[in-house]
Amino acid sequence: MARTPVSPPATSAPAERAAWLRAELERANYAYYVLDQPDLPDAEYDRLFKELESIETEHPDLIVPDSPTQRVGGEAASGFEPVVHEQPMLSLNNGFADEDIVAFDKRVGDALGKNASEPPVPVEYAAELKFDGLAISLRYVDGVFVQASTRGDGTTGENVTENVRTIRSIPLRLKGKRVPHVLDVRGEVLMFKRDFERLNERQRAAEQKEFANPRNAAAGSLRQLDSKITAQRPLSFFSYGIGVLEGMDMPATHSELLDWYKELGLPVNGERAVVHGAEGLLGFFHAVGEKREKLPYDIDGVVYKVNRRDEQEALGFVSRAPRFALAHKFPAQEALTRLVAIDVQVGRTGAVTPVARLEPVFVGGATVTNATLHNEDEVRRKDIRIGDTVIVRRAGDVIPEVVSALLDRRPDDAREFVMPTHCPVCGSNIERLPDEAIARCTGGLFCPAQRKQALWHFAQRRALDIDGLGEKIIDQLVEQNLVRTPADLFNLGFATLAELDRFAEKSAQNLLDSLEKAKHTTLARFIYALGIRHVGESTAKDLAKHFGSLDPIMDASVEALLEVNDVGPVVAESIHQFFAEEHNRTVIEQLRAPGRVTWPEGPPAPKAPQGVLAGKTVVLTGTLPSLAREEAKEMLEAAGAKVAGSVSKKTDYVVAGAEAGSKLAKAEELGIPVLDEDGMRKLLEGQL
């Protein structure tokens, strides 16, 4: 259980303020290290830590042995055996601004006497990435992996040997000839971005709680009491330091240590360099910053270490960190602010997204006033309310997002978000289909927010095939308010088109000719051109074939639409909602007005003959021995069956041939009868 936050003292007396800061930092440490549920952004923690350091510097008598400034935070969680580190796993001091790095380099140079020479001799550093994961120590005895432990409080950690044994990148036996008697390898367990996304996909599919970020996923996976669960989690590891070493001499430099680790078969990250002086340090930092977002894993800074081991020993340690190393952190990617309102915005595909309006906050190198909340379910899951103090995250060019709300700071007048029922842009109904997280505006042909997307889709080759109507022309037509709906395209004249930027007279005439040609189409193409969600070319053809003309489709109930080949509940509901929106019907009437778009009408398809498979749904998958897919389909339909393209609970039979794939697996999962070609023939003959 998380420890209850304590309110800040009413007085500003140093003793009381320091006591509160220690309590708040210890509470945050417990949440971060023990519960794996961090509730304070790094930037806020750093700010409080620096304030406590400042008070203790000014008032040394207030320093107590268990102050967070005197040790690394965290305690061993129950359920794991404690492990005492022979060589403490210390944390690093932090630098944030370029000036901090210049000052660090000067301190090191002064202490080593390099600045006293003329000219000064630049210090040699090993520069590497600061991973956003979980620090661990691996012990090898005579080259065999025997133990893994977390950092814990720096002196005592947790025994996670069985869990770490499941991480494939960690060797269980070291390679090469230079293997020591005892070696403690220090490094970081982390989860790559792609693996994190796949893990959350599995969590969603299993209807289990998703992880907030790769670090939480890595920490939670490593500290599972059941190592079988850890084995299913895609964890990775990078080596970057050393603890105990027995049986051979310590490498002379840090860079040589990492080279030796590679010889032993230990994972070592390639994004590292040996640099000289403050200029070299800052050059490495800014180079990494430029490619940070493209890296396949999360980092929150870089680490500088004096490269030579003898110089490291000369510099020594302070109580909680080495003097020879520094973590240079990127601008905070998370910060606290107040959520003052939640609006919704409509995207070009009609997606209606809640957007948080925030009190301005500087995060990720920019001032942020808006952040995405993704969808209504996310707002509910995170329990985010108007008036909350929230954690906002901004990473590089990624759209800022609200990570969570601080429930202990929730005001009494905080209000829940209510998704509007009508589009704020056009007034059309907002609908959310079953099993979909995104709500959408149903005014696809009318809504200004969706205008460009609707026009682009309408002109596609597989739709009305309006040659010459590309994205740049559509942009101009919309931005100059010349076209509001697809119907307005047929009002365009030569003079209007010829005035468009970079649109010659010949291009204008070609587009007019193409628009004239587009007036003569087919019902299937017209249906597809409307841009109804979930209605592709195949479904458009099935609708045209089944109903024969447009009016019956526009007036069809969901039940009537479900009778169409390959139309399931989600697609049927989407079609029904589209035609139920009056704005869409108005545009359609404008499109098929006299002199506009026409197509040959046809009779509705005859009802399927009553046969041995009347009312049954069959799915074909794989390659049958003697029948082509189309032949088998015709035989089944002739017997009254509906041949569907996907397996669902409504499927009655699956006919599987060679190389049957996911459809066969789904059928077996749902317990649906599976037949081969002979079984299908017997079914058609009424023998099954």
UniProtKB/Swiss-Prot annotation:
The active site is at residue 130. One of its GO terms (molecular function) is DNA binding. Its EC number is 6.5.1.2. One of its GO terms (biological process) is DNA repair. It catalyses: NAD(+) + (deoxyribonucleotide)n-3'-hydroxyl + 5'-phospho-(deoxyribonucleotide)m = (deoxyribonucleotide)n+m + AMP + beta-nicotinamide D-nucleotide. NAD(+) binds at residues 42-46, 91-92, 128, 151, 188, 305, 329. It is an enzyme of class 6 (ligase). The keyword Ubl conjugation does not apply. Keywords: DNA damage, DNA repair, DNA replication, Ligase, Magnesium, Manganese, Metal-binding, NAD, Zinc. Zn(2+) binds at residues 423, 426, 441, 447. The gene is ligA. PROSITE patterns: BRCT, DNA_LIGASE_N1, DNA_LIGASE_N2. This is DNA ligase. DNA ligase that catalyzes the formation of phosphodiester linkages between 5'-phosphoryl and 3'-hydroxyl groups in double-stranded DNA using NAD as a coenzyme and as the energy source for the reaction. It is essential for DNA replication and repair of damaged DNA. SMART domains: BRCT (SM00292), HhH1 (SM00278), LIGANc (SM00532). One of its GO terms (cellular component) is cytosol. InterPro entries: BRCT_dom, BRCT_dom_sf, DisA/LigA_HHH, DNA_ligase, DNA_ligase_AS, DNA_ligase_CS, DNAligase_adenylation, DNAligase_N. Its cofactor is Mg(2+); Mn(2+). Belongs to the NAD-dependent DNA ligase family. LigA subfamily. It comes from Paraburkholderia xenovorans (strain LB400). Residues 608-688 form the BRCT domain. It holds the Pfam family HHH_2. Disulfide bonds: none annotated. It comes from the Bacteria.
